[in-house]
């Protein structure tokens, strides 16, 4: 779902205002199961604005936030036994004050970022198109889905990156009734990822040196200052296994497994394969949902390993690869327990969702030895109250808080004093200073909906998040949207 365009439908109109269905949200990655996500259809079109601003960067590579506006449409339709869904959106905005990062989709391609010491704001445009279809008989269910996300990121002052991203997701799934209304399902998914990048300098006084980062403050020294045209090429395979009641009530079990691999290739060095990485990920979900309450246990884990290719002397402009070194590892696990209690009062609805989580993350670089360990506990509480007022109006009020409390943290940076450039060491220390300390987030939501007639409605929604970090650092996120519902 597009997070910038809030669905903003009154709980009297839409079941997703209940928090119960989100307890089993991982199950809906199987398109055969997604036809039971909502009991009724809906469509909306709207425009939104988002401002995400931090007074000083928590992570220098992510900068001080983002400002963007968005227009989009979503639909989820039911006809007899069939279900169709889809969405399309366009986003335009600016990523603010990014440093040591001239690459996009950092969470996808790290640690193999291309960087310089200048950085700055980056303009961005994003496009998304997605759709899916599912159907069922008495004993069988099936579904398919497809989505494509594209992005353009650039800067009009030196250094001048231009990044074009593309992400294609295709999945197909099926399910068989096993007992009562329970269906056992399986789905297969494929993802293709591509990012093409180039950096230009037009200042006649000289150019800034480009670095190819390799993790935890290190960089590939041999190719520093070269390779300003490059691309990332990745593929992901995934499988999902489910046990799900078509009524949406009862025990729900989901296991999602995936493997993603990608290469970083320097185009202007005869497509030299500089780096390779793989990411194995697992997500397990067990939930029990009743009419007015539910409980869920979630476990997620991943292992990411990165490799640096070693090359001999170039012959006729071609570098022969002579070795591959496994130099970077990032391993993480997270457990969470959450529950929902909800109750209706006439046309009003109240729900409360407490949760507690624990996460472990360990990043390692082999030589020089670098290591960051962060273990943290994250309790949270969220509540919503929805009620009618005046004629044909409805209001939703939501509030929540998350508290991130590190219980163990370690950092080791061998040879930091001799590392060049020193800005990369500062980058790692800066990120650790925030990740190893507490932070507290408060969330608020207000939405107003009005029925125009039996077919149409309008919705206005505003969200505000405030996160307080150490060093008098704070983040403010404001999201607003105006939607037409039909």
What are these regions (language model features)?
Residues 9-96:
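N-terminal, post-signal peptide beta-strand-biased segments of exported outer-membrane/organellar beta-barrel
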Residues 41-47, 82-88, 142-146, 182-188, ...:
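Transmembrane beta-strands of outer-membrane beta-barrel proteins
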Residues 47-53, 90-94, 137, 148-152, ...:
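Transmembrane beta-strands of outer-membrane beta-barrel pores
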Residues 180, 474-486:
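Outer-membrane beta-barrel "beta-signal"
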Residues 218-354:
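Long, internal scaffold/assembly segments composed of regular secondary structure
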């Amino acid at each position: 779902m597009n997070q910038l365009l809030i669905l903003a439908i009154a709980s009297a109109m839409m079941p997703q205002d209940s928090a119960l269905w989100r307890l089993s949200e991982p199950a809906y990655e199987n398109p055969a199961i997604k036809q039971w996500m909502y009991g009724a259809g809906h469509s909306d079109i709207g425009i939104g604005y988002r401002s995400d601003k931090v007074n000083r960067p928590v992570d220098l590579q992510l900068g001080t936030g983002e400002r963007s506006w968005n227009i989009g449409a979503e639909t989820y339709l039911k006809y007899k036994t069939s279900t169709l869904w889809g969405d399309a959106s366009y986003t335009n905005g600016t990523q603010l004050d990014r440093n040591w990062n001239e690459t996009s989709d950092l969470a996808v391609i790290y640690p193999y970022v291309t960087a310089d010491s200048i950085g700055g704001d980056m303009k961005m445009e994003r496009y998304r198109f997605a759709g899916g279809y599912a159907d069922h008989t008495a004993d069988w269910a099936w579904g398919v889905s497809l989505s494509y996300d594209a992005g353009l990121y650039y800067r009009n002052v030196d250094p001048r990156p231009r990044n074009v991203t593309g992400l294609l997701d295709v999945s197909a799934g099926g399910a068989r009734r096993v007992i009562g209304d329970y269906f056992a399902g399986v789905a297969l998914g494929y993802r293709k990822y591509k990012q093409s990048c180039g950096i230009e300098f037009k200042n006649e006084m000289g150019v800034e040196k480009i670095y190819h980062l390799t993790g935890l403050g290190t960089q590939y020294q041999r190719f520093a200052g070269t390779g300003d045209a490059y691309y990332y090429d990745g593929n992901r395979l995934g499988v999902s296994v489910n046990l799900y009641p078509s009524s949406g009530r009862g025990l729900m079990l989901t296991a999602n497994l995936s493997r993603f691999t990608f290469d970083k290739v320097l185009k202007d060095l005869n497509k030299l394969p500089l780096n390779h990485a793989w990411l194995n990920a697992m997500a397990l979900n067990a939930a029990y949902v009743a009419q007015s309450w539910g409980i869920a246990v979630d476990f997620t884990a991943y292992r990411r390993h990165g490799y640096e290719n070693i090359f001999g002397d170039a012959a006729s402009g071609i570098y022969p690869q002579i070795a591959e070194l496994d130099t970077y590892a990032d391993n993480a696990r997270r457990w969470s327990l959450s529950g929902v209690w909800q109750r209706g009062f006439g046309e009003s609805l109240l729900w409360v969702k407490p949760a507690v989580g624990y996460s472990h993350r360990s990043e390692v670089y082999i030589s020089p030895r670098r290591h960051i360990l962060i273990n943290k506990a994250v309790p949270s509480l969220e509540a919503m109250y929805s009620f009618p007022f005046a004629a044909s109006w409805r209001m939703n009020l939501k509030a929540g808080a998350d508290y991130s409390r590190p219980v163990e943290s370690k950092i080791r940076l061998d040879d930091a004093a001799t590392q060049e450039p020193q800005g990369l060491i500062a980058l790692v220390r800066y990120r650790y200073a925030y990740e190893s300390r507490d932070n507290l987030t408060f969330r608020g939501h207000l939405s107003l909906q009005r029925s125009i007639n039996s077919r149409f409605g309008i919705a206005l929604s505003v969200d505000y998040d405030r996160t307080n970090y150490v060093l008098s650092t704070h983040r403010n996120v404001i999201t607003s949207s105006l939607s037409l519902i039909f």
